C-alpha cells in the first residue's frame, strides 16, 4: 500500500503508508505561465490531471492517509541551518533539499534569460559611454541610462531620478518611498537627539531651533551608524551616516537637515555646505549606506521571515489544506534565493563583493544582528510597523503630508485583506469555532511559536477568522509587495540610480570639507564599474511576469486554486483582479503636477504597481 505525495512540482515521492488510493498534490505553484489566469480565460473546462479539492481536516474522508502524509513530511522535511547569516532555519532533510533544488531550477531559468538581456544592454551602454568620451561630470551619468537597458529594464528608470538628482526634496522623499524601513520620528521626550547641529545653521535653514523642532515632533532620523565598524574591501570606502530630517512648518515639506558621517573626522554636513559640492557628497555617502541596508535588510524581511512561517506550515498541514495551498502559491520558488545567494551573489569574490564596499562576512553580520528585530512577525504588519516608528497617526507630531510607501502599500493591503477575508469566511463557513477546532491550523501555530522559533507570531490558539486573515494578509504583503519595495526592479530604477546611489565609494571619506574635490568623480565608480553596477541591479528585475500574468494582480489566480476552492474563491479572485487592475492603471498614469511633483516627490515612484511586480519573492 502506497501513497503518491506530490510536493509542489517534485516527482512523486512513493512511501509506504496505510492507503492505496490517497493522492496529494500541492498544485498551486506557478511553475509555468499557465499558473496564472486572466479574467477572460476559461477555467471551467477539463480539470488538470491532479485536481485537488482542498478540504479542512474535519471534512476529509481519509484522515488516516492525511495524518500519514504529515508524519512523512515531519520525518523528511527538517529545520536546517540558516543561510546568509543567522536568521531563520532553512529547509533541510531529504524533502527540504529536494524542495530547494526544485525552486533553484525554476529560479535559474528566469535568471539566465534576464542576465543575457542585461549583458546585451550593458554592451550597448558601454559603447554609448565610449562615444561620449567617458563619464566626465555628474551630468554625464545620464548617458548611463539614455537609450539603454530597454531589454532588461523595459519600464525605464524612475522619471526624475536623473533630471532632479541634486534635489534635496528628492533625497528626503526617498526615505518615504524607496527605503522606508530605516526612518523613524523622534519622540519629544522618549528619544534623545542623535547629534547636535550648529544653532545658527538650523536657524538659517528652518527659521526655528533644533529643540523646537524636536519638541513639536517634527524631527526624524535615519541611522546607519551601525556600519561604522564594518570591514571594507580593499580600495572601497563608505561612511556610516546618520541623517536628520524635519517637517518644515512653513512649506509642510519633509526635508533634510543634516548628515553626520560617524567615521574618520566625523564631519556633519548640512544643505548650507555648498562649497566643493560637500552637501551633494554627504547625500551620496548616506545613499551608499542606505543601498546596502535596503538590499541586506530584505534578506531578513521579507525572505527569512516568510520562509520560516511557511516551513512550519509545510511540516504540520496536509497539502490538501486550503490555507497551506494558498501559502504554497505565495511561496513560489522562495527556497531558491538564499542558497543561490550564498553561491553566486554573496560568495567570496562574488557579485556583491565585486560591486559593494563590504565583504561577505559583513552581510552575514548585518543579517544576524538585525533579524531579532526585523524577524518579528506581528511587529512587521504594515500598519503596526509605520505607527511604531511614528510615521502614521503619531500623537506627538503632525502628519506627514505625503508618505508614498504607505499610501500605495495600504491600498494593496486592503485589497489583499478583502480577498483573504472572503477566502477564510468561505473555507471556515463563517465560523470562528471551525477555526479554533482546525487541528492542523493549530498545529501550525504551535510549530511556529515552538520548534520553528518564529518571533512574535500570533499566539495560540488561533481562534478567530480575523486573526487568521491578518496572518495570511501579511504573508501576501511580504511576498507580493514588501519585497519589491527594496528589491526586484526597484534598485535599478530608483534606489541604485547613479550618480547619487553608488554601491561603494572609491575614495576615502573626507577628513575636512576643504579637501573635497568639487566634481566628486573620484568618489564614484568608473565608467566600467558604473556599467557593472547597473548590470547587476538590472539582473534583479523580472519584466517577464507581465506577459505571463505572474504579477501581483494575479496573485491568487492559479488554476488549481480556482478549481479546487469552489465558486466563492473564484468570485473573490475576480474582484481582486479588478481592484488591482484599477490601482495599476492609476499608478501607470502618474505624472508630475504643475509643481513638478508626484506624490510630493520630484520623481515618479511606481515600485508598487500591482500590474508590474511579481506576486512572489522573486530575487
Swiss-Prot record:
Its EC number is 1.13.11.-, 1.13.11.45, 1.13.11.58. Lipoxygenase that metabolizes linoleic and alpha-linolenic acids to 9S-, 11- and 13R-hydroperoxy fatty acids. At the end of lipoxygenation, the intermediate product 11S-HPODE from linoleic acid is then transformed into 9S-HPODE and 13R-HPODE as the final products. The intermediate product 11R-HPOTrE from alpha-linolenic acid is transformed into 9S-HPOTrE and 13R-HPOTrE as the final products. 9S-HPOTrE is further oxidized by the enzyme to 9S,16S-DiHPOTrE as the end product. Changing residue 539 to A: Reduces catalytic activity towards alpha-linoleate, but retains oxidation activity on 9S-HPOTrE. Mn(2+) binds at residues 298, 303, 483, 487, 619. The keyword Glycoprotein applies. Glycans are attached at residues 32, 42, 62, 86, 164, 229, 515, 549. It catalyses: (9Z,12Z)-octadecadienoate + O2 = (9S)-hydroperoxy-(10E,12Z)-octadecadienoate; (9Z,12Z)-octadecadienoate + O2 = (11S)-hydroperoxy-(9Z,12Z)-octadecadienoate; (9Z,12Z)-octadecadienoate + O2 = (13R)-hydroperoxy-(9Z,11E)-octadecadienoate; (9Z,12Z,15Z)-octadecatrienoate + O2 = (9S)-hydroperoxy-(10E,12Z,15Z)-octadecatrienoate. Three His residues, the carboxyl oxygen of the C-terminal Ile or Val residue, and a fifth residue, usually Asn, ligate the metal, which binds water to form a catalytic base Mn(2+)OH(2) for hydrogen abstraction. Belongs to the lipoxygenase family. Manganese lipoxygenase subfamily. One of its GO terms (cellular component) is extracellular region. InterPro entries: LipOase, LipOase_C, LipOase_C_sf. Residues 1-16 form the signal peptide. The lineage of its organism: Eukaryota, Fungi, Dikarya, Ascomycota, Pezizomycotina. It is an enzyme of class 1 (oxidoreductase). Its cofactor is Mn(2+). It comes from the Eukaryota. Its main location: secreted. Residues 55-619 form the Lipoxygenase domain. GO terms for biological process: linoleic acid metabolic process; lipid oxidation. It is found in: Secreted. GO terms for molecular function: linoleate 11-lipoxygenase activity; linoleate 9S-lipoxygenase activity; metal ion binding. This is Manganese lipoxygenase. It comes from Pyricularia oryzae (strain 70-15 / ATCC MYA-4617 / FGSC 8958). Keywords: Dioxygenase, Glycoprotein, Manganese, Metal-binding, Oxidoreductase, Secreted, Signal.
